[in-house]
Amino acid sequence: MAIITIARELASLGEETAQELSQISGYKLIDKEYLEGKLNSIGITAEKRQKYDERNPGFWASLSQQRDDYLHFLKTAILDAAQENNCIIMGRGGYVILRGVPHMLSVKITAPLSVRVERTKRTFGCDNKRALQIIEQSDHDRGGFHKYFFSTDWTDGREYDLTINTGNTDPAHAAVAIDSLRKVFVDKVKEEAGVQKIEDLVLAQNVVTEIIYARKIPVHFLEATVERGSVVLHGVANAQSSIDTALAATHSLSGVKHAESAIQLVQEFTVMP
């Protein structure tokens, strides 16, 4: 039992590799269509997603509430999928959202630029110049997406357990390589620890959803950390009543064994002229 995340460059055959991997491993493929369906079901429409989905958001988009909503519910959708285990999560920063999960195997699919250009020319029926423009825009958008949402450099090979260059291999053989590593990478100890970690991450996400989105309690920059059902709330509030209400909301959730606050209380003040 494992979770595989795949980050891929445009024209690196990442999607094709993931499909092959799903077939030989029996793992469920969590792709763009799956995640879009999840986000649609909770009100993150295509119109809202188009500003952020594996894109480099503009200045105003990066400051909007829609950005926070998109990121929160993207995490929710990915964690819900990961909780089922035995899945392959395509893109969307899955390897960052699940960072630290012991039975998660992170993979990057890449290819030489010259190969990517030829593949892009075939796909779009364009010349070299246009193909290069398409690739550069995609790389810029995906790099910006990871930087703005996760403060990470997705081109850094240290972010991944395995990087595969498909310049000289096909998706079928790339998938076999990933599956072979998966079989030796994930043992019983990692599996058990990973399942527990996912449970903690899901509960932390549920806590934030309950406080911010369900009850709309005014706690700013709210984060929840969870370890085996013990929850610590972090953030900023300007009233003790907000902190108390947030703690009560946390205690009401199934799976919470203990909850405490590390929320900073900052009293409002007025600057006099």
Predicted features and spans:
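Glycine-rich phosphate-binding P-loop
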Residues: T5-Q19
